[in-house]
């Protein structure tokens, strides 16, 4: 049983260490140029339509959560009277 565990450990170690790394193109310089451009556009919109959608969804969720928290605080501050 111990021999099987050692063999399993060797196999797992071998597959992890011998996997080839994926090489991706470095897009950081392109993104830096895009976001550092002085074109009067807000940074949160320079990424395109997906960034605008993400920003709007974040703002909507934030406002909704704030309104809900205020509502719950008001309900806790003014409880219903018991008859």
Swiss-Prot record:
Q: Which residues lie on this side of the membrane: Mitochondrial intermembrane?
A: 78-83
Q: Where in the cell is it found?
A: Mitochondrion inner membrane
Q: Which residues lie on this side of the membrane: Mitochondrial matrix?
A: 24-48
Instruction: Give the GO cellular component terms, alphabetically.
Output: mitochondrial inner membrane; mitochondrion; respiratory chain complex IV
Pfam families, per database record: COX7a
UniProt keyword annotations, A-Z: Acetylation, Membrane, Mitochondrion, Mitochondrion inner membrane, Oxidoreductase, Transit peptide, Transmembrane, Transmembrane helix
A Gene Ontology biological process term: mitochondrial electron transport, cytochrome c to oxygen
UniProt-listed InterPro entries: COX7a (IPR039297), Cyt_c_oxidase_su7a_sf (IPR036539), Cytc_oxidase_su7a_met (IPR003177)
Q: Transit peptide: which residues?
A: 1-23
Which pathway does this chain act in? Energy metabolism; oxidative phosphorylation
**Keyword field contains Membrane:** yes
This protein's assembly is summarised as: Component of the cytochrome c oxidase (complex IV, CIV), a multisubunit enzyme composed of 14 subunits. The complex is composed of a catalytic core of 3 subunits MT-CO1, MT-CO2 and MT-CO3, encoded in the mitochondrial DNA, and 11 supernumerary subunits COX4I, COX5A, COX5B, COX6A, COX6B, COX6C, COX7A, COX7B, COX7C, COX8 and NDUFA4, which are encoded in the nuclear genome.
Q: What is this protein identified as? A: Cytochrome c oxidase subunit 7A2, mitochondrial
Gene of this entry: Cox7a2
């Amino acid at each position: 049983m111990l021999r099987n565990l050692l063999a399993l450990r060797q196999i797992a170690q071998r597959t992890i260490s011998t996997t080839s790394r994926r090489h991706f193109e470095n897009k950081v310089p392109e993104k830096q140029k895009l976001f550092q451009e002085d074109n009067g556009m807000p940074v949160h919109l320079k990424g395109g339509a997906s960034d605008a959608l993400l920003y709007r969804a974040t703002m909507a969720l934030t406002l909704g959560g704030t309104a809900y928290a205020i509502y719950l605080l008001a309900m806790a501050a003014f409880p219903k009277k018991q008859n």
